[in-house]
C-alpha cells in the first residue's frame, strides 16, 4: 500500500470495535485553531489512542538520545584542543542544530500526543513549525558544507585552499542566514504554518491549492532538498573516484617495489576505496531516507497525487527526527580523535578503546582536512 493512499481504517478504530461514527481527527482541536485546519483532514476518523501513545513514546526516546548524543559531540569537540579545528566547526554546528531541533520539538510533540491533539495554541503551532524548518534547513546545509569541505581536501588535494576558522564561521553564518530566510517567508504570506495529520504537529501548508502557496513548496524543495542532495552526491562521487585513483597508484607503486601492498597487514584486505564508498553510500542513503518522505508528502499535497492520511504524516515526522539521532554517530562519534577524547572523559561510554584507520575513513577524512587547515 502506498504511503499516501487511503489508509486502513483499523489504524483509526478502537481495536476493531466498531469505529467512531461521525467523529473526525479534528474534533479535539482547540476552537482557536480551527481556522488553520484544511478541510482535507475532516474526512479521517480519530486515530487509535495507541498510535498517539506509540508516537509520543518514540519521539520522547529519539529526543532524549539526540539531545544526549549531540550534546556530547558539542562538549567533546568544544573542550578538546586537538578537535577545535575549522572543519570540525561544521561538525559542531550540525550537532548544535540537531540538538536544538529535538530540544525544541520533542517535548511539545510528547505533550500533544498525550492529549491526542495540538493543545498549545496557534502561536506555538507557528513557532513549532518555524523551528522545525529552521533547524532542518540548518542541518541539511551544514551536511552539504561538510561534504564540500571533504571534496576540497580529498579531490583537490594540495591545490585546494584550506579552510580557516574565518571561512568556516562565514559558511556557518551563511547557513543560518539562508535558513532564517526560508523559515520566515510563511509568516509573511508565502505559504503558512498549520496543524497537520493527526493534529499533534504543525508544518507548512501543502494542501493549499493557491499557486502562491504551492510555489513556496516548489522553490523550497529545490533549495532545501534537490540542490543539497545533488551537491552531496556530486561531492562523494568524486571523493570515491579520487581515492580509487590513489589506490591504483599505490598498487602500481607496490608492484614496482616488488611487495604485495604498501598498506599494513591489518588493512591489506580492505581497500580504502571500498571503505569510503560504503561511507559515502551510507551518508547519502541516510540523508535520502530522512527527508524524502516529507518531500513525497508535500508534492502529493500540492499536485494531488493521492490521499494523504494522518498516519502517513507520522512516518514523515519520525524519519526526519531520526536524522538528528544518527548524525552525531556518522559525523562525530566516527571521528577517531573524538573517540579518543570520549574514552578519556567518559571511559564507561567510549565506543572503542583505540581509534583506527577505518574509523578515520568513516569520518570522511576530516582529520586530513584538520591537519591541512592547521598547517596553513
From Swiss-Prot:
Residues 353-376 are annotated as: Disordered. It is found in: Membrane. It holds the Pfam family 7tm_1. Glycans are attached at residues 22, 198. It comes from the Eukaryota. Residues 1-51, 114-128, 192-215, 303-309 are extracellular. Disulfide bonds join 125-202. One of its GO terms (molecular function) is G protein-coupled receptor activity. The modification N6-(retinylidene)lysine is found at residue 321. Keywords: Chromophore, Disulfide bond, G-protein coupled receptor, Glycoprotein, Membrane, Phosphoprotein, Photoreceptor protein, Receptor, Retinal protein, Sensory transduction, Transducer, Transmembrane, Transmembrane helix, Vision. Residues 358-368 have a biased composition (Polar residues). Its main location: membrane. Phosphorylated on some or all of the serine and threonine residues present in the C-terminal region. It is a multi-pass membrane protein. Gene3D superfamilies: Rhodopsin 7-helix transmembrane proteins (1.20.1070.10). The chain crosses the membrane at residues 52-76, 89-113, 129-148, 168-191, 216-243, 279-302, 310-334. Residues 77-88, 149-167, 244-278, 335-376 are cytoplasmic. CDD domains: 7tmA_photoreceptors_insect. GO terms for biological process: phototransduction; visual perception. Belongs to the G-protein coupled receptor 1 family. Opsin subfamily. Visual pigments are the light-absorbing molecules that mediate vision. They consist of an apoprotein, opsin, covalently linked to cis-retinal. This is Rhodopsin.
